[in-house]
Regions:
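Catalytic-core signal marking the mid-to-C-terminal active-site face
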Residues: 4-19, 27-28, 32-39, 361-473
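N-terminal glycine-rich anion-binding loops that anchor highly charged ligand groups
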Residues: 11-16, 28-41, 48-50, 88-93, ...
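Flexible, glycine/charged-enriched surface loops at secondary-structure junctions
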Residues: 30-37, 50-51, 131, 191-193, ...
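Glycine-rich anion/phosphate-binding loop at the beta-strand->alpha-helix junction
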Residues: 200-366
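Conserved active-site and cofactor/substrate-binding residues in soluble primary-metabolism enzymes
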Residues: 11, 15, 31, 35, ...
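A glycine-rich phosphate-binding loop feature that marks nucleotide/adenosyl-phosphate handling sites
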Residues: 36-42, 274-280, 314-323, 352-356, ...
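Catalytic alpha/beta active-site cores
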Residues: 53-240, 244
Length: 473
């Protein structure tokens, strides 16, 4: 049977839901967007305009949950690539927004560059285990300006061919984004059908739906673009100092935003995606390596399944800033448990030190950890062809199973997971794991087959970029 790990039983999941309803009904959420308050008020929420507090009747929450699709498929530009949500498989989403990069030559930390962004983007595009894009390196150009955003999206869709998850900061940026999506994917209806892009929307903890980003999101409503709702409550800082209460706060924030999404455009796909986190209590800093991240991630996955919603789970990372023993054990613990809860999307490969430092070698090592976790999830098969009683009877006491065809068949069918890094001959050659990973990265990038945009599409994007430049002067 497959392994499906849990940290909350059915009664505890129900308690999270019921306590969430009480908070939404009696305490509410501060909604900074006037447009969002009006949409929610029209849908039946109780709006206290002066304090910008919105309270959500239980009937509104339950109807919004009913309206949210329980399964849909994410697409991308690559022909034949798609990712069905809520269909029993898991893909990786590359972690994002690193400011620094571990230099492959010196091993030292330096500021990330556009070349780093390009290398990281091409690498994750080439790795089959990574199906969803975030910007791994926060690049220097002024991304806040429309021209910078259009140029950025042109580069994204040129170099990454699977599913893109991103956001905008302003209504104006959202308008440019919709133009880009129409050009790249062939119009509004094609975007609605293919779902090549999902919008990351992040309520602010505790219990705030902020203004600018929410208005930016509402600009794309009606295009069928999935909303990945990712509040980031931090235990002991922006949520109470208990794992279960942090789970409740995150759930409140997701459901409040889900109500807004469904009120604005019923049937819009939603991804349940809270990034529940904790701190280092001795310093107050966010700590990626704390084992509690794994527990919180599993709880979030379970709540999504409780509602029947697709889920994007965030793992913990590591407190370390270079590859090594600490990074290894923190990653293994914080990845194995959430993966065994089996979300649709798992966020996290490639970054160190609270998701601020990119390391290419660690990215590849994280993918290898995920491959091992995926094998663990499969568990022990017990189908009728798995027991091999007839083979045991045929070979009998003292028999040699190594040369029997059933052993070969089991190997070919995946009964063993064969790792691709850290093979014995590597150590005999005294390469070391990082050197091996570095060599493998070069091989992957050399073998990658680019899928450039059609010339006419690329030229139209250039034209949009020029128009955006005129707008900003």
């Amino acid at each position: 049977m497959q392994i499906q790990i849990q940290v909350l039983n059915q009664d505890e999941l129900t308690q999270v839901h019921e306590r969430t309803l009480r908070i939404l009904v009696h305490i509410g959420v501060r909604v900074e967007s006037a447009q969002a308050r009006k949409i929610l008020g029209d849908a039946g929420a109780h709006v206290e305009e002066k304090r910008r507090i919105v309270r959500f009747p239980q009937t509104l929450v339950e109807e919004s949950l009913r309206l949210a699709p329980k399964d849909f498929t994410l697409g991308g530009r690559r022909p034949g690539w798609y990712w069905p949500m809520n269909h029993g498989d898991c893909t990786l989403l590359a972690d994002g927004e690193a400011k620094w990069v571990v230099d492959a030559e010196t091993g030292k930390r330096r500021t990330g560059t556009e070349d780093d962004w390009l290398k990281a983007t091409q690498l994750i595009d080439a790795l089959d285990e990574i199906g969803v894009y975030w910007r791994m390196v926060s690049t220097p150009p002024p991304q806040g300006k429309p021209r910078g955003k259009v140029a950025y999206w042109r580069n994204v869709f040129t170099h990454f061919t699977k599913h893109v998850q991103d956001s905008t900061e302003t209504v104006e940026q959202s308008r440019w984004l919709l133009e880009v999506l129409q050009i790249v994917f062939g119009g509004r209806e094609a975007v609605k059908l293919l779902k090549p892009f999902s919008f990351l929307v992040c309520p602010v903890s505790p219990l705030v739906i902020e203004g600018s980003y929410t208005d930016a999101y509402l600009q794309i409503i009606g295009w069928g673009i999935p909303a990945a709702i990712m509040p980031m409550p931090i235990m002991g800082m922006t949520s109470p100092a208990r794992l279960i209460s942090t789970t409740v706060v995150g759930n409140c924030e997701v459901l409040a935003m889900l109500c807004l999404v469904q009120a604005a455009a019923p049937g819009t796909p939603v991804i349940y995606a809270p990034a529940l986190a904790t701190t280092e209590p001795r310093t107050g800093r966010y700590t990626g390596g704390a084992v509690e991240h794994a527990l919180l991630s599993i709880a979030a996955t379970q709540m999504a399944r409780f509602y029947g919603l697709p889920v994007e789970a965030s793992t913990g990372g590591t407190n370390e800033y270079i590859p090594g023993i600490q990074a290894g054990y923190e990653r293994a613990i914080n990845w194995t448990l959430p993966t065994l809860a089996w979300p649709d999307i798992l966020v996290g490969p490639g970054l160190f030190e609270g998701s601020t430092v990119l390391c290419y070698e660690q990215l590849l090592l994280d993918v290898e950890v995920f491959r091992h976790c995926r094998r663990l999830h499969l568990g022990i098969g017990t189908g009728k062809d798995q027991w091999l009683e007839e083979v045991i009877a045929r070979l009998g006491p003292g028999g040699n199973f190594l040369k029997h065809p059933s052993t070969r068949d089991a190997l070919r069918l995946g009964e063993w997971h064969l790792g691709t890094l850290g093979e014995p001959e590597v150590f005999q050659k005294k390469l070391g794991l990082l050197a091996e990973a570095r060599g493998r990265i070069n091989e992957i990038l050399a073998a990658r087959k680019p899928l450039p945009l059609d010339e006419d599409i690329d030229q139209e994007l250039v034209n949009i970029e020029r128009r955006a430049q005129v707008v900003v002067g």
